[in-house]
């Protein structure tokens, strides 16, 4: 399966042109800048119109307008994952958002703990600690995700959040993809990541 991975478009999704072919497109959060409902609606209209067989997205810390939202009316091939999963062509995707209301309580840690053990492709907004998470001399990734990774047998982990670490890394047989499109200054677009994952 060919996956197009992007993240952290921060309201500039319509500036993306000539996206490459893929079977599935995944957006791992921060499609908004200020978190307004209007931003989210514009993103959803754009995302739903993309010409991919399946489209998956989660929310990041800039997307709080969707906290607790029940998103109805999406096309059958558009999947909003909020501490939930979906199986596509034998591969099990699971998505954990990053809402600020959860981050300031212990809810976020509990959400990570609940990631199913049979997950093939994990989608989070935050990276795991020490993996494509470095900026300004600090590793900003989640230690809870890093701990959970040891319990999983992933094929890939897709995330964003740390703009300075856009890229792909393979470690212990797992593909790690930081799909952040914007740089640290919110000015330059990076090329979306393409990863290949073997179907189950």
Regions from the PLM with identified roles:
Residues 85-89, 144-152, 156, 163-200:
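Binuclear metal-dependent phosphoesterase catalytic core
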Residues 5-7, 25-30, 55-61, 81-82, ...:
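Active-site neighborhood of phospho(di)ester-bond hydrolases with catalytic His/Asp-centered motifs
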Residues 37, 117-153:
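Active-site-proximal segments of metal-dependent phosphoesterases and phosphodiesterases across multiple
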Residues 104-107, 126-127, 131-137, 169-170, ...:
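A short secondary-structure junction signal
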Residues 10-11, 32, 63-64, 98-101, ...:
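Short, solvent-exposed loop/turn segments at secondary-structure junctions
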Residues 6-88:
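Core catalytic region of metal-dependent phosphoesterases/phosphodiesterases
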Residues 40-44, 78, 107-112, 137-146:
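Charged helix-capping and loop-helix junction motifs
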